[in-house]
Amino acid sequence: MSNVEKKISQLQQQLNQYNHEYYVLDQPSVPDAEYDRLMTALIDLEKTNPELKTIDSPSQKVGGQALKSFTQVTHQLPMLSLDNVFSLDDFHAFVKRVKDRLNDNQAIVFCAEPKLDGLAVSLRYEHGQLIQAATRGDGSVGENITTNIRTIKSIPLKLMGTPGKDFPDIVEVRGEVFMPKASFDALNTLAKKRGEKGFANPRNAAAGSLRQLDSKITAKRNLAFYAYSLGFVGKLSDGGAESTDLTNDFFANSHHERLCQLKRLGLPMCPEVRLLESEQACDAFYQDILAKRSALSYEIDGTVLKVDEISLQKRLGFVARAPRWAIAYKFPAEEELTCVEDVEFQVGRTGAITPVARLKPVFVGGVTVSNATLHNQDEITRLGLKVNDFVVIRRAGDVIPQIVSVVLDKRPDNAVDIVFPTSCPVCDSAVAKPEGEAVLRCTAGLFCAAQRKEAIKHFASRKAHDVDGLGDKLVEQLVDEKLINTPADLFKLTEIQVSTIDRMGKKSATNLINGLEQAKSTTLAKFIYGLGIREVGEATAANLANHFYTLAAIESASLEDLQNVSDVGEVVAKNIINFFKEEHNLAIVSGLSEVMHWPTIEIKSAEELPLAEQIFVLTGTLTQMGRTEAKTALQSLGAKVSGSVSKNTHFVVAGDKAGSKLTKAQDLGISVLTEDGLVALLAEHGITI
């Protein structure tokens, strides 16, 4: 098995596990950003190695698996998820993509609904009788929960109307099962009285109730249901086989009207559903639902906006896991009040000393939050924060806890000023605040254990050398055991040394040594990035490699030489020069370059570099190629790929969900390429995607 096959297999296993935790167990163990990072890595690898992509890859799934305690049901039509946006600009970008794809300038009418926070299910009616119900599962295969669904009072066991006239033999209805707030409160009150553990939120309660093997328990949970779409609609032959799709024969060409038809058949429809004729009306609907969110009898976490005309939906089609004609416009992060019990100081890879607030645990945005970063002294001054203050905490982007403000009216008598350390809290070395920076830094460099650990973690990270078997915890153990002090020391480790580490058996030790051996083969760009030079990210490292071609040329480059590189200004150039001035850094670089190797970068002629000196910025999601593939293709033609838009940018490539970079490009009058435009440009120069 090749290294690429191993990596793809490893990513698939990880993502399958995380899908299982999130969709089946309702116990996610990693943040969304980490999941997205792994999914992007898998998609990129499968894009460049299509022969290794399997039909059961997580990249082809919506998420989750059927529980083994229930029989499995295969959905005739997949139950897809929705893409998300979090801002008005992103919603407008979605509408623009819809209009661009339709390319006929007609007004778009949307069907708008609250985004219910429950569990997606599919109900199958045959000859008007409810004969089967299933969860979404992984989108293709779900759990058979028919017995439990039949206990929900709002779901009809028999459709109203006349079979053959009002509906065909088979009607599949998709919708959301949820637990009303009042039912949730009553359930948890009862659990408390019994000394039992309650549910964290109504969604978990609904999911747990539907997965009861004893339907009598489900019946007591007072679940509810709203229909939101159709699944397969067709005819049964005498032998029971399903025939062609009859949806258009019985249901309207309007999504909204189809919901009304389902309501007439006896299926409940969310009362807040609206038909809207402009983007402005969609935003007003969003604001209205957000304002009345707390007053609704059920939990929601945003709005769903769908192109109403079914024929347009068919023209727009789908991407792998979601329709192009619908979007979930999510609400901002939730906020709660809590108390700052203490402030501790952490030391990062570059010596930055970051204050972290230790909070009285508070439940916000669906999780318990006990820590929040305070960034730097300026942020603390801006907030006017003291230890023991009451603060408003927000989960920014529903991921990162953030202190929004101090509630001065509730400031206690024992509020204490936050005092920054005068020496490093880890190694006790001197600290300094570089001119023009807001961050206090430890001056000890790799002498500081905290910086050593973070530098080695960075070196081994996926974007750098992706050392298989070397996680953050193991790095900390290796440093604490004094087995390594620098990234170069990694390559001196032996299996015997590693196997002495707690919880590291012979197999794990062998895997790590093999992973380090594989990491010796790299690229100059990854080598530079892995050194962890301040403010030298992936794009800048690649630009340095493609500009200077060799490590020696980068080491000896002058300030002026460095500033001739795309994305390198005076500050970054000085950081690079200062890095290579330090003797201990040079020793590490020398040690690494002795054991690591990379292909020579060929110096191409001007004819071979038709995009020389052209600066490109990639934004949004590319569906025909991965970002890495696009970046590599552009760089092979001489282009510089930058991470930010400026007046010097020549082209911005805007994929799906392009955000602020696209807006800035439009403001600056910079040429914008769609993904199709990029594919065409590359094809002009002999690169076929």
From Swiss-Prot:
Q: What is this protein called?
A: DNA ligase
Family annotation (SUPFAM superfamilies): BRCT domain, DNA ligase/mRNA capping enzyme, catalytic domain, Nucleic acid-binding proteins, RuvA domain 2-like
Domain (BRCT) ranges = 606-689
The active site annotation covers K115 (n6-amp-lysine intermediate)
Q: Which reaction does it catalyse?
A: NAD(+) + (deoxyribonucleotide)n-3'-hydroxyl + 5'-phospho-(deoxyribonucleotide)m = (deoxyribonucleotide)n+m + AMP + beta-nicotinamide D-nucleotide
The organism encoding this protein is Colwellia psychrerythraea (strain 34H / ATCC BAA-681)
Cofactor(s) needed by this chain: Mg(2+); Mn(2+)
The reply on keyword NAD is: yes
Q: What does this protein do?
A: DNA ligase that catalyzes the formation of phosphodiester linkages between 5'-phosphoryl and 3'-hydroxyl groups in double-stranded DNA using NAD as a coenzyme and as the energy source for the reaction. It is essential for DNA replication and repair of damaged DNA.
**Which keywords, in A-to-Z order, does the entry hold?**
DNA damage, DNA repair, DNA replication, Ligase, Magnesium, Manganese, Metal-binding, NAD, Zinc
A GO cellular component annotation in the UniProt record? cytosol
Q: Which PANTHER family does the entry mention?
A: CHROMOSOME TRANSMISSION FIDELITY FACTOR 18, DNA LIGASE
Provide a GO biological process annotation: DNA repair
* Name of the top EC class for this enzyme: ligase
Q: Which family does it belong to?
A: Belongs to the NAD-dependent DNA ligase family. LigA subfamily.
Output the Gene Ontology terms for molecular function.
DNA binding; DNA ligase (NAD+) activity; metal ion binding
Residues engaged in binding NAD(+): D32, A33, E34, Y35, D36, S81, L82, E113, R136, E176, K306, K330
Q: Which residues bind Zn(2+)?
A: C424, C427, C442, C448
- EC number, UniProt record: 6.5.1.2
